[in-house]
Each structure stands twice: as structure tokens, then as C-alpha cells.
Amino acid sequence: MKSNKKSLRHFITTMLFILLLTFANNTFARDYYQIKVYNIKNAEQEAQIENYLKMAYIPAMHRAGFKTIGVFKPIADDPAAGTKIFVLIPLSKVSDIDLIEEKLSGDKELQTMGKAYFDASFDNAPYERIESILLKAFSGFPEMKIPELATPKSEQVFELRSYQSSTEKIGQKKVEMFNTGGEIDIFKKLNANPVFFGEVLLGKDMPNLMYMTSYKNVESNQQLWQAFGNDADWKVLSAKEEYKNTVSHIDKWLLHPTDYSDI
């Protein structure tokens, strides 16, 4: 009898440990993101990339189990208009990158629908270069959130920003400013509809972080930044000595989602 009770206690203890471990893993799990940037030089390349993404790549990603792929183009007034197309791919783990390559390489429909893209000649390439960026979500914003914007996609604005830092250590202070300093909370409070915040693990502008916010239109974006600059919490946070000079360069793009974007 004592042996049975001891075995039962051991079983219960083991199950509790497994449950707690599972809970901990789920609690601290963070998304990864791949951002692919197609650099283009003219309307012909833009049309080629859009046709490939809409008719071949996005459907293939859906078949591979990746259901939420964002595709964005700079708005007409953005300096990058007509020169870039951004593709945002949320990942649950880094190994998903290998899984995507494995799934897509065996997708015959992708090869058929994307034939013009894959078989493009050396003197008529559909793009100039492709840039790939890998990010890990901030602990203070571990999962991507798809905004609910009550306007047509043609009016919606997604702002993508990249903050570079002078050194890795200084860059970590800027990440800290978002995570525990309260900068993410300010964005939430002001209804900036954050999509993601992430630290760049691989990319050409490291050390840097990137994040995306969203708005129903251009005017809402402008109003947000005016309110942000005047916010009392931001004034206190930005005045802290430990966070000064944590950003050495900022890149920003105002983007519209395409009509076939999942975000």
C-alpha cells in the first residue's frame, strides 16, 4: 500500500512538473519575424513581384501552414515609393525558416504559378536585390497582433521603423527602454495599434531594432506622433540619462498593405 501511495505521489509530482514546464515555455515564448525586402527600379519589376507574390508565393505559404503573410508597399508620398516591396513573415521558431524552404521546394504549384519569376533572364530580372532580415520579438510584446482598422486597405497606413544604435550594448539599452522602460506602453496608450516590436538578429544595419505600428489613414499617423511627442510619460522616459543617445540613426517607411496581404 505504501509503495502504491509513493508511486502515486511521484506520478502527481512528475505531472505537475511537466505542466509547469509547459506553462513556462508557453509564457516566455516569443515570435520570430522574417522581413523580405524586394528592391525594385521600375513599374515593370513591381508588377512582376506583385504577380509572383499574389498568385504564387502567398498561396504556397498558406499551403505550407503559414497563414498570415503581410505584404506592404510605400505610400505615394514616401521617398521609397516605387522602389521597395516588404513581405512580413511571422514565425513561431527559427527552424520555421528551414521548414518553409523545405515545403516550398517541393510545391509544384508554386513552380507552375511562379514560372515567369523563377525563369526570368539575367537581363530582365524581376528585382534588383532581395534583403532578408530576421528578428526576435521583444519580451514586452512577444506576439504579433493584427490590427482591426475600420478603413479600406488602400487608406490604411503601416509605419515600419528601424532604430540603429552605435554599439550592441547601447542597442540593448534601447530595447530595455521599450520593454521595461515603458515605451511600448506609451504606444498602446495612444492607440498606435502596434503590430510587432523586434530585435534584429540578422540584417545589414545591426545593431538595430525594428517595429511596426498601424493607422486607419495618414492623418491618424500624423496625430499619433504629435500626441507621442507631447505625452507626459514620454517626456519623463526620454529625459532619463540612461536612455539618452541610444539611437544613432532612424529609417522609417509609411506603407499601405496590398489588397492580397493577410495583415
What are these regions (language model features)?
Residues 12-23:
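Bacterial N-terminal signal peptides
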Residues 26-111, 116, 120-234, 244-263:
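Short S/T/G/P-rich N-terminal loop/turn motif that feeds into the first structured element of a domain
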Residues 6-7, 17, 94:
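Generic alpha-helix initiation/capping and coil-helix boundary signal
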Residues 1-9:
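N-terminal secretory signal peptides that target proteins for export/translocation
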Residues 3, 24-25:
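Intrinsic-disorder/low-complexity regions
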